[in-house]
């Protein structure tokens, strides 16, 4: 597969761009996750970064990317409402993997947002979307801009939800390459990878959480619930980070 120039692809029509990326994705599907990471770092134009919510299986992507390029910027969009265990997990993995961590937050503090808008997460889908835009989307766009990122790695997996089932490994979003190396991994593959590298799950995994985000929009799994129903009161699966331009994302791993 030839090297891809972002500027060249952005100059194409949407149809031409889609067809070109589809050809590449056919080949990427044949590679292992490790091979995909190496290929992306060698063949995609622009500085790389990995976004991480430091969720249940976050250690997988952190290991995969940093073992190839140890100084890759790790971007965390911190809402200020993460679980205490998440902040401890961030410290643990940052120390264990010597992460080049960059933390971005909303322009308004959590208290300021509540004073202005009330508790947005209690205001239905519209409120949740506004909350996500303020605390996830805008800080992430600022991160990509300030760090001059051209290749954005994320740990989304098709198995996690219906909204992710048809995502490609490589796409373009917000003017950068978006790359999902473990898109086709199963929970079993994730488990064995963590075991092989002696890496931990998020601490709340043992307490029955399948997905972890903010304290006020994360529920412990109960019998009969899907993973999607444990987030945002079942109203949404995605946190908004990559719903821009018709694409979907969320915490990933």
From Swiss-Prot:
It catalyses: [thioredoxin]-disulfide + sulfite + adenosine 3',5'-bisphosphate + 2 H(+) = [thioredoxin]-dithiol + 3'-phosphoadenylyl sulfate. InterPro entries: PAPS/APS_Rdtase, PAPS_reduct_dom, PAPS_reductase_CysH, Rossmann-like_a/b/a_fold. It is found in: Cytoplasm. The active site is at residue 239. It comes from the Bacteria. It holds the Pfam family PAPS_reduct. GO terms for molecular function: phosphoadenylyl-sulfate reductase (thioredoxin) activity. GO terms for cellular component: cytoplasm. The keyword Repressor does not apply. Belongs to the PAPS reductase family. CysH subfamily. Catalyzes the formation of sulfite from phosphoadenosine 5'-phosphosulfate (PAPS) using thioredoxin as an electron donor. GO terms for biological process: hydrogen sulfide biosynthetic process; sulfate assimilation, phosphoadenylyl sulfate reduction by phosphoadenylyl-sulfate reductase (thioredoxin). The gene is cysH. This is Phosphoadenosine 5'-phosphosulfate reductase. Gene3D superfamilies: HUPs (3.40.50.620). NCBIfam families: cysH (TIGR00434), PAPS_reductase (TIGR02057), PRK02090.1 (NF002537). The keyword Oxidoreductase applies. Its EC number is 1.8.4.8. Its main location: cytoplasm. SUPFAM superfamilies: Adenine nucleotide alpha hydrolases-like. It is an enzyme of class 1 (oxidoreductase). Keywords: Cytoplasm, Oxidoreductase. Coiled coil: none annotated. Pathway: Sulfur metabolism; hydrogen sulfide biosynthesis; sulfite from sulfate: step 3/3.
């Amino acid at each position: 597969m030839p090297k891809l120039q972002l500027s060249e692809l952005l100059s194409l029509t949407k149809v031409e761009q889609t067809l070109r990326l589809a050809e590449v994705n056919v080949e990427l599907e044949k590679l292992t996750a490790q091979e995909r990471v190496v290929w992306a770092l060698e063949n995609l134009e622009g500085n790389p970064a990995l976004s991480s919510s430091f969720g249940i299986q976050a250690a997988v992507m952190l290991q995969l990317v940093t073992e190839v390029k140890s100084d890759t910027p790790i971007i965390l969009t911190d809402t200020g409402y993460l679980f205490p265990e998440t902040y401890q997990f961030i410290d643990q993995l940052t120390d264990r993997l010597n992460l080049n961590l960059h933390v971005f937050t909303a322009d308004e503090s959590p208290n300021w947002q509540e004073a202005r808008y009330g508790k947005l997460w209690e205001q239905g889908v519209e409120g949740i979307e506004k909350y996500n835009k303020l605390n996830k989307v805008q800080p992430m766009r600022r991160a990509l801009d300030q760090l001059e990122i051209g290749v954005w790695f994320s740990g989304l997996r098709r198995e996690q939800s219906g909204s992710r089932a048809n995502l490609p490994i490589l796409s373009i979003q917000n003017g950068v390459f978006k790359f999902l190396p473990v898109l086709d991994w199963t929970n079993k593959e994730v488990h064995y990878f963590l075991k092989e590298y002696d890496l931990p799950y998020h601490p709340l995994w043992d307490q029955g959480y399948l997905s972890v985000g903010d304290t006020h929009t994360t529920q412990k799994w109960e019998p009969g619930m899907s993973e999607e129903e444990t987030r945002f009161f079942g109203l949404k699966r995605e946190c908004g980070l990559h719903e821009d331009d018709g694409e979907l994302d969320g915490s990933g791993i």
